[in-house]
A protein has these predicted regions:
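Conserved PLP-enzyme active-site core in the AAT-like
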Residues: 2-228
Length: 228
């Protein structure tokens, strides 16, 4: 048993057989029937309008930030979040986006008061806050799930302040199972979600990004720009 990470999970024999026999096509031309079915199913499961397959969770998160933010904008993130700690500074290096780290509590949450205090006032001297990012489950804090009630509260805060909410849901199915809720309920307050296929779901590679049709159309263009 390898307990380093769930990233070392491997496809089952049944999964390998399904891959070998899968219908294939060109995803860039959007005529790969298997990828299309995967994207349709992902959007349906998360009750969002559209979905996009990406090579990695890191790319999925970066695409979300690039769609939600313009260069020079600011995003509120947890100081122990994967986006802030473990994604090679992509938001800044490739997007010109400034992170505003907020302390993660032991239960993985960001205090609502801390989020509110981090939202920049309208002022020519300040960056413009565009986005709040949550991570569910929160990996560094022990894999704890963020509750539906908490996620709804953050979503309400985002809407009241004209911000978007992105969820790094690399392990969102773990959270849904632990909380005994559906993933679509758990992500309902969000504008976009990334979830991984290559962790507990045991696929060899890949992640999904879900959101509105307009969001995914822009993300598809940016995926090509990033080489995906």
């Amino acid at each position: 048993v390898d307990l380093r990470s769930d990233t070392v999970t491997r496809p089952t024999p049944e999964m390998r057989e399904a891959m070998a026999e899968a219908e294939v096509g060109d995803d860039v031309y959007m005529d790969d029937p298997t990828v299309n079915k995967l994207q349709e199913k992902s959007a349906q499961m998360f009750d969002k309008e559209d979905s996009l397959f990406v090579p990695s969770g890191t790319m999925g998160n970066l695409l979300a930030l690039l769609v939600h933010c313009q260069r020079g904008d600011e995003v509120i993130v947890g100081d122990k979040s994967h986006i802030y700690m473990n994604e090679a500074g992509g938001m800044s290096a490739l997007g010109g986006i400034q992170p505003h780290p907020v302390k993660n509590q032991a239960d993985g949450t960001l205090l609502l008061d801390d989020i509110l205090a981090s939202i920049q006032a309208e002022d020519v001297h300040h960056t413009i806050t565009r986005l709040i990012c949550l991570e569910n489950t929160q990996n560094v804090c022990g894999g704890v799930p963020l509750s539906l009630e908490y996620t709804r509260a953050v979503g309400k805060t985002a809407r009241e302040n004209n911000l978007s909410l992105h969820i790094d849901g690399a392990r969102i199915f773990n959270a849904a199972t632990a909380l005994n809720v559906s993933v679509k309920e758990l992500v309902e307050p969000s504008d976009s979600v990334m979830f991984c296929l290559s962790k507990g779901l045991a696929a060899p590679v890949g992640s999904m990004l879900v959101g509105s049709k307009k969001f995914i159309t822009r993300a598809r263009h940016l995926r090509k720009m990033l080489g995906g």
